[in-house]
Amino acid sequence: MFNSSSLNVYFICGTQDVPEGKDIREILKQALEAGITLFQFREKGPTSLDGVEKEHLAIDLLKLCHDYQVPFIVNDDVDLAEKINADGIHVGQDDENVKSFAERFKDKIIGLSIGNEKEYYHSDLEHVDYIGVGPMFATISKNDANAPVGPSMIATLKNINPSLPMVAIGGITEDNIEPIAQNGADGVSVISAIARSHNIDKTVTKMKSYFK
């Protein structure tokens, strides 16, 4: 059964997010040692890997996560997630309906991106373990990100469905988490804040401190 505490510090990363000269495996290892609670492999963009290279990297990262008993989630790529037996899948509003994923992913974690109340009410949540709500703030990590909805969107959706685990996403740094936690989020999902941190251990520790 999915535990909402897995969302406390949710790291999302692909090779396109890693600073030049750094290796994603080493960054993930540092993040795991620092105490991240969930990892999502999101390999997207003009410089990203595909095919066999992407699959081999995914397997390396999956093994790393399992060494630390941290769930490994794949973004969007259902075929890859199935092939490597990932712990779950995260899908967006533009993807095929969630029910079809659930049928292929029995006993796996399924996450869904939701940006506002309208998307919430139009989403099939029966098979969803958690939702990613955002963007909270303006973000540089996603070129196609929508306008920020702010931390209050978490409170709005929690009022509608208090038992549904929710993780905040978009433009989050270690310095703007407090209002997110105050509005009832179960955790934060970040890309650049960890991938480009000068001290990953310190960054993750500070993030975790808001969700004790």
Curated annotation (Swiss-Prot):
Residue numbers binding Mg(2+): 76, 95
GO BP annotation list: thiamine biosynthetic process; thiamine diphosphate biosynthetic process
Pathway of action: Cofactor biosynthesis; thiamine diphosphate biosynthesis; thiamine phosphate from 4-amino-2-methyl-5-diphosphomethylpyrimidine and 4-methyl-5-(2-phosphoethyl)-thiazole: step 1/1
Molecular functions (GO terms): magnesium ion binding; thiamine-phosphate diphosphorylase activity
Keyword Cell cycle found: no
Residues that bind 2-[(2R,5Z)-2-carboxy-4-methylthiazol-5(2H)-ylidene]ethyl phosphate: 139-141, 171, 191-192
Positions of 4-amino-2-methyl-5-(diphosphooxymethyl)pyrimidine binding: 40-44, 75, 113, 142
Co-factor requirement: Mg(2+)
Keywords: Magnesium, Metal-binding, Thiamine biosynthesis, Transferase
One family name in Pfam for this protein: TMP-TENI
EC number annotated for this UniProt entry: 2.5.1.3
Cited PANTHER family: THIAMINE-PHOSPHATE PYROPHOSPHORYLASE, THIAMINE-PHOSPHATE SYNTHASE
Purpose: Condenses 4-methyl-5-(beta-hydroxyethyl)thiazole monophosphate (THZ-P) and 2-methyl-4-amino-5-hydroxymethyl pyrimidine pyrophosphate (HMP-PP) to form thiamine monophosphate (TMP).
Family classification: Belongs to the thiamine-phosphate synthase family.
Protein's recorded name: Thiamine-phosphate synthase
Organism (species): Staphylococcus haemolyticus (strain JCSC1435)
